[in-house]
Regions:
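Predominantly soluble domains enriched in secretory-pathway, periplasmic, or organellar proteins
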Residues: 22-343
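Residue-identity detector for glycine
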Residues: 5, 20-23
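Bacterial N-terminal signal peptides
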Residues: 10-20
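Bacterial N-terminal signal peptides that target proteins for export
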Residues: 1-11
Length: 343
C-alpha cells in the first residue's frame, strides 16, 4: 500500500503528465478526423480531406468575405473550432474591425453560432485551456478577453497595455503571455487566476510569434525584425537565452511546438521553415524551403512526421517531412491561409 506521501507524488506526476498532453494538444492540435484551414485572404474557413488534400467544403465565418478570419482554436474534445473575425485589414491598418468569434461544429463542418465581443474590437490571437475557456486578444482595444464559450459570456477584459496580437498560454493555464508586436517593446504577462497583468518581458524590437513549451517551463518569443528567438523562463519571467535563426536575415513570423513536444518549427516571410530540437535549442538547425512565402500557420499530422505549412502569399499549402527536413509536395488551398490544424 502506498504511503500518503507517495500517493501525493504519484497524483502529482499524473497531473503533470496530463497537463503536458493538454498543453501540446491545445496549442498544436492534431487528429485524423479532419483538417481545417483559415483562408484569411479569401475570407473563408475551408475543410480538407487530410489524406487526399482535396477540399470538402467551405464557409464564410464573418458577416461577408471582406471581414476576414485570422486565427483559430480547437476545443479540447475536438468537437468545435473557434475562429476570430479580425476585420477588413491587417495589423495597424484595420479600418473596419470585426467583433465576433465564429463557432464551428467540426463534425458537420457548419457554423453553429458566434460570440459577439463588443464593445471590444479586432479579435486576433486565441487560445483555449483544458476546461474549454477561451482567451482572446483584441488588439485595437488593448485587451485580452476571457470567455466562457458555453454561454458566450465575457468573464474578464484584461488590460495588457499594448495591442496584443498573438498569445501563449501555459499548459496549466496559470499564466498568459501576450505578444504586442511593434506597439510596445515588451511581452505582457498575465496571471490567469487574478485576471491581471503582472509583468513585462522586454523585447528589443517587439515580437509577434510566441509559443509556450508543453512542460510550461519556457516561452519562445520571435524577434520582430532580427532573426532571433528569445527564450523566457516562466518561473521568473526573464529572458535566459537567445537563439540565432540560421540562414535568416529578418524576423520570425510564428513559432510552433510539435504535438509530441520534440520539435520547434518557426516560419519566416521568406518561405523558410526552420526545425529545432525542442530539448536542445542550440543543436544544429534544419531548414526547409517551402513552395511559397509569407509563411504563418503550421498544422501537424497525427503520424508525427508530417507538417503542413500555409503559403499565405500564394494560396497554397506545402507538405513537409519533418524527419528528413524535406519538401514533399504542394497543393492549392484558397487564396491565402494564415492558420490551419488537424483535428
Amino acid at each position: 500500500m502506498r504511503s500518503n506521501g507517495s500517493v501525493r507524488s504519484y497524483a502529482a506526476a499524473l497531473l503533470l503528465a496530463a497537463l503536458g498532453a493538454h498543453g501540446a494538444d491545445l496549442s498544436s492540435p492534431t487528429g485524423s478526423s479532419g483538417l481545417i484551414m483559415i483562408d484569411k485572404v479569401g475570407g473563408h474557413v475551408r475543410f480538407f480531406d487530410p489524406k487526399s488534400d482535396q477540399e470538402l467544403s467551405s464557409l464564410v465565418p464573418g458577416p461577408d468575405e471582406t471581414i476576414k478570419p485570422h486565427d483559430l482554436a480547437i476545443s479540447p474534445d475536438h468537437k468545435r473550432a473557434y475562429v476570430t473575425i479580425y476585420g477588413d485589414g491587417v495589423y495597424g491598418r484595420n479600418p473596419h474591425p470585426g467583433h465576433t468569434i465564429a463557432i464551428i461544429d467540426l463534425g458537420s463542418r457548419k457554423m453553429v453560432g458566434s460570440i459577439d465581443v463588443s464593445p471590444y474590437e479586432a479579435p486576433h490571437g486565441i487560445r483555449v485551456d483544458a476546461s474549454g475557456r477561451l482567451y482572446v486578444a483584441c488588439d485595437l482595444s488593448r485587451k485580452v478577453l476571457v470567455i466562457d464559450p458555453r454561454t458566450g459570456k465575457i468573464e474578464s477584459a484584461i488590460d495588457v497595455e499594448g495591442t496584443g496580437h498573438r498569445l501563449a498560454l501555459l499548459p496549466d493555464a496559470s499564466k498568459l503571455y501576450v505578444a504586442n508586436k511593434s506597439d510596445r517593446l515588451f511581452i505582457s504577462v498575465v496571471d490567469v487566476k487574478t485576471r491581471k497583468m503582472v509583468g513585462r518581458v522586454a523585447m528589443p524590437n517587439g515580437t509577434e510569434g510566441i509559443a509556450a513549451s508543453p512542460d510550461g517551463k519556457t516561452v519562445l518569443a520571435a524577434d520582430l525584425t532580427e532573426p532571433y528567438l528569445h527564450v523566457i523562463a516562466t518561473a521568473t519571467d526573464t529572458e535566459v537565452d537567445k537563439i540565432k535563426v540560421e540562414g535568416a536575415e529578418h524576423g520570425v513570423y510564428t513559432i510552433f511546438y510539435s504535438p509530441d513536444g520534440k520539435r520547434v518549427l518557426i516560419c519566416l516571410a521568406s518561405g523558410q521553415v526552420d526545425i529545432l530540437d525542442a530539448h536542445d535549442l542550440h543543436a544544429p538547425q534544419r531548414t526547409v524551403h517551402s513552395a511559397g512565402t509569407a509563411l504563418m500557420g503550421i498544422g501537424f499530422a497525427p503520424d508525427g512526421n508530417t507538417a503542413l505549412v500555409g503559403n499565405h502569399a500564394q494560396g497554397t499549402v506545402s507538405r513537409i517531412d519533418l524527419t528528413h527536413a524535406s519538401l514533399v509536395g504542394t497543393f492549392a488551398a484558397g487564396k491565402g491561409v494564415e492558420m490551419l490544424a488537424y483535428f
